[in-house]
């Protein structure tokens, strides 16, 4: 019984953290849209498109946490792994670790899953 409760709690913690991080990193996503401000006169470089796509992948991963946990974890890890090393600057490790916390909780939940 205890492992079932632990498993369920860890999954809910991961989902709630995903929602909170969706809003946190979503605000930065909206702010990064300013990179496209001069789109009409001069389109942004390819790297800007790639980084924005990686950021969007991260955000979609947070939303997928409510539907498909394994897909969510994959999207969160890919999005964070591509986005933060290039955009995070000297704090990239901290940003990346913060971003993948829901994935860590999902891994812990899967490890605590009761034997069937």
Regions found by a protein language model. Name each.
Residues 1-7:
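Short, Lys/Arg-rich, polar N-terminal cytosolic tail immediately upstream
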Residues 30-35, 71:
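Membrane-helix interface motif
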Residues 33-44:
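Membrane-interface helix termini and inter-helical loops of multi-pass transporters
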Residues 46-55, 94-99:
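Alpha-helical transmembrane segments of polytopic membrane proteins
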Residues 55-62, 76-84:
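Hydrophobic, membrane-inserted alpha-helices
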């Amino acid at each position: 019984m205890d492992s079932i409760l632990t498993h369920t709690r860890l999954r809910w913690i991961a989902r709630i953290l995903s929602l909170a991080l969706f809003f946190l990193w979503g605000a930065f996503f909206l702010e990064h849209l300013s990179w496209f401000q001069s789109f009409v006169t001069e389109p942004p470089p390819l790297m800007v498109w790639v980084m924005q796509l990686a950021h969007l992948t991260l955000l979609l991963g947070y939303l997928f946490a409510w539907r498909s946990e394994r897909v969510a974890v994959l999207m969160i890890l890919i999005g964070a792994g591509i986005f933060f090393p290039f955009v995070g600057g000297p704090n990239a490790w901290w940003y990346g670790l913060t971003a993948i916390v829901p994935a860590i909780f999902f891994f812990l939940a899967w490890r605590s899953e009761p034997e069937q």
